[in-house]
């Protein structure tokens, strides 16, 4: 998805969406993002939400893209292409603009947290994303959803979209509630935010206290806050032009 935002977070273009093609190599992803950007009006800087772990702009892990298709085993050739790939520099070269890239849950979290104590953001989509903030600062990204869930499954797989289709709505909801409890036991957050495309499939009345469902559009709106909340641990800016006060756009991932 992509849009252009004003400095105060107002969308000044329609959201454009493209399905992720598989197999998705770095070159394929860059081309898809270029095509998304071409649908948008002029912009001054770029924020990208990526479905994997990013350290210093480089890919540390990306469960989704190292598989030929969702649900298939990892492909060693795709793992080799993605591990250590300097995505941030590649994006800066592609767009010729200042760029920040971070995990997509980190980006969404930047838009929804209050900056009070320990805050945990969980995104439910193709897989499961996680972001942790303390007093408004984004902590180094951790793939908490890689933890085990029952026999032979990770939390990311058990609560992901493929399994939702296999097991049905009620079983999927039970799994998600179990996973949320496990995350809370590990992180001890003061508040838990739940976003992503499948968050709407939960009943907010069943969530209990200190849990909030947030709109999926916050994944785009977080593109602005990403520049304010991130440090060197997860994302660092690469500038090819002078940075301006204009909105970071497009945001995609």
Where are these regions (language model features)?
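Glycine-rich phosphate-binding loop plus the immediately following alpha-helix
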Residues: 81-108, 137-175
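Glycine-rich phosphate-binding loops at beta-strand->alpha-helix junctions
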Residues: 54, 183, 187-216
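Glycine-rich phosphate-binding loop and adjoining helix at the ATP-binding site
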Residues: 19-34, 38, 44-45, 53-112, ...
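A short, acidic, amphipathic alpha-helical segment used as a generic capping/interface helix at domain edges
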Residues: 172-186
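Short glycine-aspartate micro-motif
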Residues: 45-47, 119-123, 193
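Anionic-ligand binding region
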Residues: 117-120, 126-148
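Short beta-strand scaffold segments in enzyme catalytic cores
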Residues: 1-6, 110, 128-134
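Short glycine-rich, Thr/Ser-proximal phosphate-binding strand/loop in the N-terminal lobe
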Residues: 1-31, 73, 137-165
């Amino acid at each position: 998805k992509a849009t252009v935002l004003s400095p105060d977070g107002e969308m000044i273009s329609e959201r454009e969406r493209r399905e992720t093609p598989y197999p998705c190599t770095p070159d394929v992803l860059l081309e898809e993002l270029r095509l998304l950007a071409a649908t948008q009006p002029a912009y001054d800087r770029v924020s990208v939400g990526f479905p994997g772990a990013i350290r210093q702009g480089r890919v540390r892990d990306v469960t989704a893209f190292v598989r030929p298709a969702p649900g298939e085993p990892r492909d060693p050739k795709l793992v080799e292409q993605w591990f250590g790939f300097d995505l941030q520099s590649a994006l800066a070269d592609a767009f010729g603009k200042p760029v920040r890239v971070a995990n997509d849950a980190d980006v969404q979290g930047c838009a929804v947290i209050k900056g009070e104590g320990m805050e945990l953001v969980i995104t439910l989509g193709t897989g499961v994303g996680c972001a942790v903030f303390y007093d408004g600062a984004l902590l180094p990204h951790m793939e908490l959803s890689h933890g085990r869930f029952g026999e032979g499954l990770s939390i990311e797989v058990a609560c992901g979209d493929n399994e939702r289709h296999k097991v049905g709505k009620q079983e999927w909801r039970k799994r998600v509630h179990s996973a949320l409890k496990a995350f809370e036991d590990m992180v001890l957050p003061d508040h838990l935010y739940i976003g992503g495309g499948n968050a709407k499939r939960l009943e907010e009345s069943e969530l209990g206290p200190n849990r909030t469902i947030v709109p999926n559009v916050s994944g785009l709106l977080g593109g602005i806050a990403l520049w304010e909340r991130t440090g060197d641990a997860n994302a660092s800016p690469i500038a090819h032009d002078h940075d301006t006060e204009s909105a970071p756009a497009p945001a995609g991932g």
